[in-house]
Amino acid sequence: MAVIKVKKTGQVIEGEDNVRAFLNSQGVLYEHWDITKLPEHLRDKYVLTDEEKEEILATFKDEIEDLAARRGYKTWDIVALSDATPNLEELLKKFEQVHIHTEDEVRAITAGHGIFIIKGDKETGYFDVELEAGDVISVPEGNPHYFTLMDDRQVVAVRLFIDPSGWVAHPYEEKEEVNS
């Protein structure tokens, strides 16, 4: 289950209803998928063949199509990151820069962990959203944020897009301190 840490205040928000309410107040969609649907051989596996990626997409076909229908997503894929990922450090450097997108950034975590650092409203400032398997998040179009891995340095996620070109980040020049 996702955990939120507000950087300015140190406040920690836990529990699905509390997390959903806080994220909703910040314009961020949060849902939770039943991760027990995932076949055992794909749980906690971070190096995936194309066939295994397709199996994950097929497992969550109904959830993906429902989310796509509600929010206008047209294409989806799987991203898998771990220490076995070629050029992982370069990818993380790219992901860890504060940026925006011209569409929502949607991730449904199917294994592992990740953190979105999201700019909230003026009063809230930046907050971390620690995600684990089953958590689904959609950072709104134009909202400054970045993503990184947690200490275990491994995640598998379904990504949904409106634009077929996929993940396209636009740098965001931050005027406030991200870490406080």
UniProtKB/Swiss-Prot annotation:
Provide the residue positions that the database annotates as binding Fe(2+): 99, 101, 105, 145
**Catalysed reaction equations from the record:** 1,2-dihydroxy-5-(methylsulfanyl)pent-1-en-3-one + O2 = 3-(methylsulfanyl)propanoate + CO + formate + 2 H(+); 1,2-dihydroxy-5-(methylsulfanyl)pent-1-en-3-one + O2 = 4-methylsulfanyl-2-oxobutanoate + formate + 2 H(+)
Q: For binding Ni(2+), which residues are annotated in this chain's numbering? A: 99, 101, 105, 145
Cofactor names = Fe(2+); Ni(2+)
Keywords from the named record: Amino-acid biosynthesis, Dioxygenase, Iron, Metal-binding, Methionine biosynthesis, Nickel, Oxidoreductase
Enzyme Commission code(s) on record: 1.13.11.54, 1.13.11.53
Q: Which GO terms describe its biological process?
A: L-methionine salvage from methylthioadenosine; L-methionine salvage from S-adenosylmethionine
Q: Name one GO molecular function term.
A: acireductone dioxygenase [iron(II)-requiring] activity
For the site labelled Important to generate the dianion, the residues are 107
Kindly tell me the pathway this chain contributes to.
Amino-acid biosynthesis; L-methionine biosynthesis via salvage pathway; L-methionine from S-methyl-5-thio-alpha-D-ribose 1-phosphate: step 5/6
* Record note on cofactor: Binds 1 Fe(2+) cation per monomer.
Oligomeric and partner information: Monomer.
Concerning its family, UniProt says: Belongs to the acireductone dioxygenase (ARD) family.
| Full protein name | Acireductone dioxygenase
Natural source organism? Geobacillus thermodenitrificans (strain NG80-2)
